[in-house]
Amino acid sequence: MSTDKLRAAVVGCGSFGANHLRAIAQSADCELVAAVDADSERAGAAAASHPGCEALIDWRALAGKVDVAVVATPTLKHSEIGCGLLEAGIDVLIEKPIAATVAEAERLVETARAHGRILQVGHLERFNSGVMALERMVTVPLFFEIHRLSMFAPRSLDVDVVLDLMIHDIDIVLALVGKLPEEVRAAGVRILSSKVDIANVRLAFPGGCIANLTASRVSTEKVRKLRLFQPHQYISVDYTRQDGMAFTVGDDRQIGFQPLGQDKKEPLVAQWDSFVDSVRRRSAPRVTGEQATLALRVCMDILAKIEEHGAVVAQTLHEV
């Protein structure tokens, strides 16, 4: 396994891209080579914040210059740019959702496979210390209750709340249950945008596990909580605090308490370190393209159910 520093670049220098640039710049295993954005001023500003980093406006110029790259562009560009980088022999960490359509996601997965490249997808909550502690405790998941509420942010108007927020929780539930749902029920409302801003979903899995999920980007407070019920145990995780608590009924019928997520690390940094480790070892990443495609597929099923039942559009005051 080579110990040389990996040459790295970030494609897309918006808010997410800027955070990735920071994480890479902090890594002792990488050399930040380039910041790429179609907006030359944005690329220049991003590169200027990191000495030795070159500003580029065309991602194609990365061929031969870097070993790894982050794709943090709008979702509609993920497939084109991701596949192009993979074909150029570059390992890729691509932001979620993996692509705009399932077909595009499958193309990314196949391209990575055909060219022997690592493809990891940025489902950041998988690197939340509370979630990682939860994973180690799951036995037979029976019921999930998950809430993810945010204040409105104009940056995400190109996607609905299901693909913007709920997909994190869909990915986690699929990873913990290990199966696809056999039934999907969903309702959604458009409040402040032309996309669904609030969604409520019920997933039923083979074996009887149920997951109730609510996501909203029209809230006065930020809420990120997961509750899992399984035989003799209730586990609560606070994504924001990266911690939680497990309540377990013992043989003596007494309830024991166990705190979770004590070894905290910034998820973005943990994600990058994990990606670098996969690249060096040529091993499967923690969040594979295949897993991200399944999460996207379920999200598309949810959106189809919402449209099937007619997404409610909030009335303006003069219509009431």
Per-region residue spans from a language model:
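A contiguous active-site-proximal alpha/beta segment in oxidoreductase catalytic domains
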Residues: 99-156
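C-terminal helix-rich "cap/oligomerization" subdomain common to oxidoreductases
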Residues: 1-2, 68-71, 277-320
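Active-site loop of classical SDR/Rossmann-like NAD(P)-dependent oxidoreductases
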Residues: 19, 259-273, 287
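Hydrophobic residues in well-ordered beta-strands that form the structural core
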Residues: 94, 119-121, 237
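Contiguous beta-strand/loop segments that form the cofactor/metal-binding neighborhood of enzyme cores
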Residues: 170-243, 269-284, 318-320
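Mid-domain beta-loop-alpha active-site segment that forms a flexible
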Residues: 122-129, 152-181, 291-292
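N-terminal Rossmann-like dinucleotide-binding module
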Residues: 1-50, 173
